């Protein structure tokens, strides 16, 4: 594919990004050492290249590469390592001076530490203050706090978390004026603009405002967990993250309007650039939106200067600029997902689309039918290419990949293409009496249709496939190596780039089929807060058994186990139904798919309210309910049965089973697989099978 051939800026940007990623793995001194070693290596390579090939441009290229690594090492050291060192040395109880830089929500604030004790610092942190929800940008606070490392792993730029040690010693100095002439001030202003526009959308769209805000301004705060999970499982999360698709649709629609009224090209570029910047501020400078707008500016600049542009170079430069001015963005998974998906659409997708013929049949019906088929094929290939470029991130960070994304994106593509500009128009004219009514009605109906499609594909059986299997890890690593090599070398036929994709799909499907057919059932016991939860794994199937009379909700425990073992729950068995089980079931259903809930038949009237709540929750999330008698066994998977009595829990397998009495800590075993909690006084016996 020769990705870097005659794209020297692209190569320099790649080296910059690669060094940015690698340097995050080392401490402050390590960054300088690694940066210096990389520069020495580049210089040595340049010397040998000049001696052997006598290329005149090589010294300039190598100088640019050295400069990229050096700048990145310096930037990473100053803007990451030094704040890290300051932050971790401040851990403990102390008096702090902070300034509010963003009121993110009720009683929750993004702040910058100005002083810890007698030491002046500049550290971004998060602060929660019970009962205080009227702070604004620029307000300063002084209080005693317990300083700890931040728990929010999704935003590593927030290094510390502050817990008030003494609520009575909080002193607040209100800001006399807002200083928007700083990075924090600009971000605060953009959040104020986003909040104001979000309030306007709330008034226009009503109950559908949460989705509309996600589509238009990247504001997903009001989207509930269940809806967010549905978008993730259906592989359509990109719809709610302002990115190149949103910029293309909205700016493309604006460009069509300007063309229709015969506006000159240079004026069109100026208008679209200003509107794009305003839109970027409304999106609170989300990384994917920043990348898209910088790419747009780069393309327009090339059109003005050279009448042509190179999209790959624009993409690499835009990401490099983001990392340069915001070093902590290297930790932003969303930015890298946006970058990789866009790279795939720019590099690999054209090799498919260019070979697709444009149907020109004499029969109009056949001609348009063929065009629809070609459009469907291109839409599917866009999803396939994007998912393969995202495969490393999906494997390493999420452990699963959505198969439902292929048909779901195919169905949603025309709907979203219409919905995006329609929502933008509705947001503008929706408050005008009578005029806005049809726009609001049409937008809300399209949102309902989109959500129905997303929810349907989110619940498709095996729509999400786990990548946690050992064979999956091997296949993903091999694919990454082969695919990366093919991207940078010269290929006789560029269509060869699709060979690793096909090979991965076929090999993975074969391995998964063999694994499902031959895997023995495993029983995993997970203990948390004194309660036990059993995961019964049989190939790709997973069942969960809640076997404790514990008063704590175990939703987080089950979800953590799910992330390791499976992507959905086939059967969820509740042995001792209680109020905590209702909360647990609600939490689990919001974050994953549960196919069936199995509970014992109730014996006393006092259990009726609990059973009513369980049935109501099952109806809400479209879950089947099954009741079983005490003493009877329930088939969990093909080879495992569960038996409940008043005395014990029994797990029965093909050849052997173990019993653990209810009064003791539990033993679970099947064949060679077992999870045993040590207890010297434990007694268990082997049960005969009928």
Question: What function would you assign to each model-found segment?
Answer:
Residues 11, 40-44, 55, 228-405, ...:
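Hydrophobic alpha-helical transmembrane segments in multi-pass membrane proteins
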Residues 32, 128-144, 171, 181-185, ...:
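Non-globular, low-confidence helical/coil segments that flank catalytic cores
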Residues 73-238, 602-604, 620-623, 633:
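Membrane-interface helix/helix-cap signal primarily in integral membrane proteins
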Residues 1-26, 302, 366, 425-455:
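Hydrophobic alpha-helical segments
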Residues 1-87, 163-165, 291, 486-491, ...:
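N-terminal leader/targeting segments
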Residues 98, 145, 215, 243, ...:
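Divalent metal-coordination and catalytic microenvironments
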Residues 187-190, 194-205, 258, 369, ...:
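Membrane-interacting alpha-helical segments
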């Amino acid at each position: 594919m020769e990705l870097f051939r005659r794209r020297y800026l692209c190569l320099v940007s790649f080296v910059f990004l690669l060094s940015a990623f690698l340097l995050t793995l080392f401490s402050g001194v390590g960054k300088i050492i690694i940066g210096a070693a990389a520069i020495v290596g580049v210089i040595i390579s340049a010397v040998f290249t000049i001696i052997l090939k006598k290329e005149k441009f090589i010294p300039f290229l190598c100088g640019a590469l050295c400069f990229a690594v050096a700048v990145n090492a310096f930037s990473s050291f100053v803007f990451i390592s030094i704040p890290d060192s300051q932050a971790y040395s401040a851990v403990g109880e102390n008096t702090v001076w902070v300034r509010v830089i963003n009121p993110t929500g009720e009683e929750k604030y993004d702040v910058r530490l100005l002083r810890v004790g007698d030491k002046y610092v500049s550290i971004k942190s998060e602060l929660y203050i019970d009962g205080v929800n009227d702070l604004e940008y620029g307000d300063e606070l002084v209080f005693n706090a317990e300083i700890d490392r931040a728990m929010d792993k999704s935003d590593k730029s927030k290094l510390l978390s502050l817990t008030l040690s003494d609520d009575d010693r909080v002193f607040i100095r209100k800001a006399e004026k807002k200083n928007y002439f700083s990075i924090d001030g600009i971000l605060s202003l953009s959040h104020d603009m986003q909040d104001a526009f979000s309030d306007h959308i709330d008034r226009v769209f009503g109950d559908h405002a949460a989705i509309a805000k996600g589509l238009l301004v990247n504001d997903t705060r009001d989207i509930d967990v269940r809806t967010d999970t549905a978008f993730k499982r259906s592989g359509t999360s990109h719809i709610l993250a302002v990115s190149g698709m949103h910029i293309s649709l909205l700016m493309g629609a604006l460009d069509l309007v300007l063309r229709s009224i015969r506006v000159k090209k240079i004026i069109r570029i100026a208008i679209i650039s200003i509107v794009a910047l305003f839109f970027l501020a409304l999106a609170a400078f989300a990384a994917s939106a920043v990348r898209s707008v910088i790419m747009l500016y780069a393309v327009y600049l090339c059109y003005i200067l050279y009448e042509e542009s190179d999209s790959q170079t624009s993409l690499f430069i835009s990401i490099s600029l983001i990392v340069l001015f915001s070093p902590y963005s290297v930790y932003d998974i969303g930015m890298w997902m946006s970058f990789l998906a866009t790279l795939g659409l720019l590099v690999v997708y054209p090799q498919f689309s260019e070979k697709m013929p444009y149907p020109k049949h004499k029969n109009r019906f056949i001609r348009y039918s063929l065009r629809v088929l070609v459009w469907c094929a291109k839409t599917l290939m866009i999803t396939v290419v994007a998912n393969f470029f995202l495969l490393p991130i999906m494997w390493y960070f999420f452990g699963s990949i959505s198969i439902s994304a292929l048909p779901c994106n195919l169905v949603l593509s025309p709907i979203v293409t219409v919905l995006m500009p329609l929502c933008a128009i509705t947001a503008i004219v929706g408050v005008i009496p009578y005029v806005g009514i049809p726009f609001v009605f049409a937008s809300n109906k399209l949102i309902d249709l989109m959500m129905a499609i997303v929810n349907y594909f989110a619940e498709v059986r095996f729509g999400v496939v786990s990548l946690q299997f050992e064979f999956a890890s091997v296949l993903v690593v091999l694919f990454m190596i082969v695919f990366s090599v093919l991207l940078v070398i010269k290929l006789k036929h560029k269509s060869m780039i699709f060979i690793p994709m096909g090979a991965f799909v076929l090999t993975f499907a074969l391995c998964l089929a063999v694994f499902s057919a031959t895997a023995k059932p495993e029983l995993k016991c997970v203990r948390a807060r004194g309660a036990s939860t059993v995961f019964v794994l049989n190939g790709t199937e997973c069942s969960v058994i809640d076997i404790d009379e514990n008063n704590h909700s175990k939703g987080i425990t089950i979800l953590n186990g799910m992330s390791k073992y499976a992507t959905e729950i086939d059967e969820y068995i509740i042995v001792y139904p209680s109020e905590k089980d209702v909360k647990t079931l609600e939490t689990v259903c919001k974050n994953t798919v549960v196919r069936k809930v199995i509970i014992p038949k109730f014996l006393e009237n006092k259990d009726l309210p609990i059973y009513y709540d369980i049935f109501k929750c099952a109806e809400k999330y479209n879950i089947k309910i099954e009741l079983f008698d005490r003493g009877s066994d329930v088939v969990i998977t093909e080879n495992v049965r569960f038996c409940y009595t008043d005395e014990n829990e029994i797990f029965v397998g093909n050849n052997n089973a173990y019993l653990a009495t209810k009064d003791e800590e539990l033993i679970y075993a099947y064949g060679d697989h077992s999870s045993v909690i040590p207890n010297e006084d434990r007694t268990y016996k082997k049960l005969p099978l009928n």
